[in-house]
């Protein structure tokens, strides 16, 4: 990316999202972060990451749920990203057994909302992060993209596999 781009990063307060946003901001790209800042991981850590990102003039942020299609669409239409990097997800294999609806809502409906708005605004690039959990019951310890992904072992893994299928379609 040699030209400066407008990039939406969902999950921008998470470990990977923050690191990516920081790197791209330092290169001069305009970054729009979108994150629910839920309490699955330490909220104070997420807020401190946002404080660092907010020091950049080329960073803007909205706290929101991906399931809130109206808020998401309004925010994205205002920013007009050329690239969307979708890293946000409700994470955690064990927690998905306790609150499966949250995983279905955030990971499937939220990702569908991202795909839909990306299509609507005709972004040049859409990157959607998945998880090694989609490989489920495979026996080998190092996975390949060509390995089977038809035996998920958790709701979390099933939602991530579902988002892959939705994106592919």
Question: What function would you assign to each model-found segment?
Answer:
Residues 1-169:
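N-terminal Rossmann-like NAD(P)+-binding domain of SDR-like oxidoreductases, especially those catalyzing
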């Amino acid at each position: 990316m040699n030209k400066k781009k407008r990039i939406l990063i969902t999950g921008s307060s998470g470990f990977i999202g923050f690191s990516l946003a920081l790197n791209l901001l330092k290169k001069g790209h305009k970054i729009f972060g979108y994150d629910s800042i839920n309490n699955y991981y330490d909220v104070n850590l997420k807020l401190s990451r946002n404080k660092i990102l907010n020091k950049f003039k080329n960073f803007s942020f909205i706290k929101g749920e991906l399931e809130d299609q109206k808020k998401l669409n309004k925010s994205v239409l205002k920013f007009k990203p050329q690239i969307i990097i979708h890293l946000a997800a409700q994470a955690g294999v064990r927690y998905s057994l306790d609150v499966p609806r949250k995983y279905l809502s955030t990971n499937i409906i939220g990702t569908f909302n991202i795909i839909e708005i990306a299509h609507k605004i005709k972004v040049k690039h859409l990157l959607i992060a998945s998880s090694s959990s989609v490989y489920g019951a495979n026996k080998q310890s190092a996975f390949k993209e060509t390995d089977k992904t038809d035996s998920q072992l958790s709701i979390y893994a099933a939602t991530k596999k579902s988002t892959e299928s939705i994106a592919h379609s």
